[in-house]
Amino acid sequence: VALCDIKQEWAEGGKDKIAKGYARLVAKEKMTQEKVDGILASITPGLKEDLCKDCDLIVEAAFEDMQVKKTTFAELDKIAKPECIFASNTSSLSITEIGNGLTRPLIGMHFFNPADRMKLVEVIAGVNTPVETVDAIKKISEEIGKTPVQVNEAAGFVVNRILVPMINEAAFIKMEGVSDIAGIDAAMKLGANHPMGPLELGDFIGLDICLAIMDVLYNETGDSKYRACPLLRL
């Protein structure tokens, strides 16, 4: 497995973060050190120019910005072998637009945080994504222990179109003084049986990501119900 970033030290830092996560599992006796060593040995951190030439599947997880993703794939398109499958981990952006101009089809392969524990993968086909690519990504998802759910291309797909507006509404409730952060989170945990309150979840996801998703939903639909709470812009 190639783990790539725009700087070598960032890629190595990514592997270090993975190693720390596995160390916690070993400490809790949920995984053996031998298995962890084998997993870490299979991960090579580096730059895409050096490591992506022979990949069979590339999953992009760049910042949730259309131009950043388009530029990343345009660069990869010059490096990767023709049969390599391109997949984006975008949480809300158009697969068709991201893939426009590439010499190969693109597919959405949206994992959920934390990816090592969350079972779902949203599989999103763009206008030019062939059935064979969809089937291949579903099969790969199952092989790595995930449950693939195919969704049609639409802003936010399924989970984030439901989840992030809830977080946004919680921010409005805080802004309007209906309750404080602790009260809002406690109400949803105890009253709706959510494992995590919406504002705590927003922090976990990243408020910048929540804002980016709300902006995509609003810009794509023009529906005022997706207007981002001003608190998310602070």
Label for each model-derived stretch:
Residues 1-5:
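Short beta-strand "acidic-cap" motif of Rossmann-like dinucleotide-binding folds
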Residues 52, 85-153, 157-161:
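Rossmann-fold dinucleotide-binding core
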Residues 131-135, 142-153, 171-234:
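NAD(P)-dependent Rossmann-like dehydrogenase/reductase catalytic/cofactor-binding core
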